């Protein structure tokens, strides 16, 4: 317990002295999305979501080409940091990074020093010293991507943090719905199952309601969050 408290104190101290950071990515003023990180769906407004969907549609055609190679991210270094098992999300990010020309490093929990007892803070500090451009993070702790974004110079993409959020999955789901129906306003969406512990459900509720969909949830009362109506359901 004392060790855990010491870790928290060390993290808080590090956060306080890590405010003067510079990011390698410049904000593109032509895009509606002008933020460094992608961590929470609930912080995305309608224009930002539509910006992601518009850009994503370009790569649907790109992925149908025989030669799927771009230099858009040439010279950029991306770390895939997956501290939970994943197949679809991890490989999707890996394929995307490589097709866009980035240098990609995959780090799994079993391959990291965290597996030997090193703190996440120490691991992130070490990786940050390698000057990465993007960190893609999957972790069982809620809010961890936000914490990491405050101690590194790289852009952070949340690939799932506990039962909190999974914004990229929700954006993909929104793109699928757009391809099928061509609109969002007036659509009635039902999300079924364990809503309380589903990060995908939470992110979908945030993004789809922002786009104008009517959201309904279906599941046992014990698996529905008590504050569900505050989420726009």
What are these regions (language model features)?
Residues 67, 71-178:
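Phosphate/diphosphate ligand-binding glycine-rich loop within oxidoreductases
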